[in-house]
């Protein structure tokens, strides 16, 4: 009888320890998710604000039939500054922040979760993922974020290409689109967005994670320096944006069709229209050189900020 009581108390203690361990693990998981959300939000906000004037200029060229050149782009920036003031260069940035903060928070947090899930599935717990799951984690993270925040991206594009008299604020854009064009307009361009996000996010995260892994292997240091992270992020942005750029042009044309005089159409009809009117290379890669300037800066800032914030928050928690 004494042995039975002793065995029962041992089992009870083991059960209590298991419950306690589960609670601690759950609390740690919640902290990790919140940490990723916060770090991602800050990373996205800093990166997009830094390149907002270049981003607005790129969108204006993407949705028009004007030929793009670096000279014309900087002339547009200069005349916008002269005619509308310095802060007008950031017009639409409030809408960008409303979209980018949740988008980046979701994307980075989802990426961490997908890495964990795929690591468990492929048997790489606590280790760097092999190439294919690494690419898949990035693509899934980008698709998740784009699906949840797409209407905000359309609103941002509308505000970037219209004069301030047309839309007074973000809510005004939503109201006018709903009344004049219908709610379904808020998802025009969604398909090319997702088709573009898959290679963009997949290749961006894949390149950045791969470069960090190679750095760790060859340098012997567990963590890169901040400037090295910036370089890795810049390379990731350059590769990701170059691969997905034509679909980005198609997406912008579809999003802004209601205010630029173009007809709403499918992906293929929009592609054909761009190629017919402007040519394949000039039309589908219009503004790419500006993206090669702003993309690496934005992605470098974004990835570096996220990593450094994660390190800081882990230290504070410990």
From Swiss-Prot:
Protein keywords: Membrane, Mitochondrion, Mitochondrion inner membrane, Repeat, Transmembrane, Transmembrane helix, Transport
Q: What is its main location?
A: mitochondrion
Q: Which Gene3D superfamilies match?
A: Mitochondrial carrier domain
What one GO molecular function would you report for this record?
ADP phosphatase activity
Where it sits in the cell: the answer is:
Mitochondrion inner membrane
Q: Which residues cross the membrane?
A: 33-53, 89-109, 135-155, 186-206, 230-250, 293-313
The name this protein goes by in its record:
Mitochondrial coenzyme A transporter SLC25A42
The answer to keyword RNA-binding applying to this record is no
Q: Which domain of life is it from?
A: Eukaryota
> Record keywords: Chloroplast included?
no
Spell out the residue ranges that the record assigns to Solcar repeats.
31-117, 129-214, 224-312
Protein task: Mitochondrial carrier mediating the transport of coenzyme A (CoA) in mitochondria in exchange for intramitochondrial (deoxy)adenine nucleotides and adenosine 3',5'-diphosphate.
């Amino acid at each position: 009888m004494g042995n039975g009581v002793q065995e029962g108390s041992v089992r009870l203690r083991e059960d209590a320890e298991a419950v306690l361990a589960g609670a601690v693990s759950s609390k740690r998981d919640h902290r990790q998710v919140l940490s990723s959300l916060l770090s991602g939000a800050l990373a996205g906000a800093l990166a997009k604000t830094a390149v907002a004037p270049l981003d607005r200029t790129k969108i204006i060229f993407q949705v028009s039939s004007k030929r793009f050149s670096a000279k014309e782009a900087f002339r547009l920036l200069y005349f916008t500054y002269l005619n509308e003031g310095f802060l007008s260069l950031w017009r639409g940035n409030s809408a960008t922040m409303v979209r980018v903060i949740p988008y980046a928070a979701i994307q980075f947090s989802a990426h961490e979760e997908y890495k964990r899930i795929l690591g468990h599935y492929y048997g790489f717990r606590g280790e760097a993922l092999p190439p294919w799951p690494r690419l898949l984690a990035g693509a899934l993270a980008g698709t998740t974020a784009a699906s949840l925040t797409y209407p905000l991206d359309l609103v941002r594009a509308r505000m970037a290409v219209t004069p301030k008299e047309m839309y007074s604020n973000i809510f005004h854009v939503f109201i006018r689109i709903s009344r004049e064009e219908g709610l379904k307009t808020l998802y025009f361009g969604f398909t090319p967005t997702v088709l573009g996000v898959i290679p963009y996010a997949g290749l961006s995260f894949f390149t950045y994670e791969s470069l960090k892994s190679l750095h760790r292997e060859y340098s012997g240091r567990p963590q890169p320096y901040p400037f090295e992270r910036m370089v890795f992020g810049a390379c990731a942005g350059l590769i990701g944006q170059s691969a997905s750029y034509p679909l980005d042009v198609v997406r912008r044309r579809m999003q802004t069709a209601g205010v630029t005089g173009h007809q709403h159409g499918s992906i293929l009809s929009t592609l054909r229209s761009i190629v017919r009117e402007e040519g394949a290379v000039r039309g589908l890669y219009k503004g790419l050189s500006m993206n090669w300037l702003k993309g690496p800066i934005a992605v470098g800032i974004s990835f570096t900020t996220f990593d450094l914030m994660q390190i800081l928050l882990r230290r504070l928690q410990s």
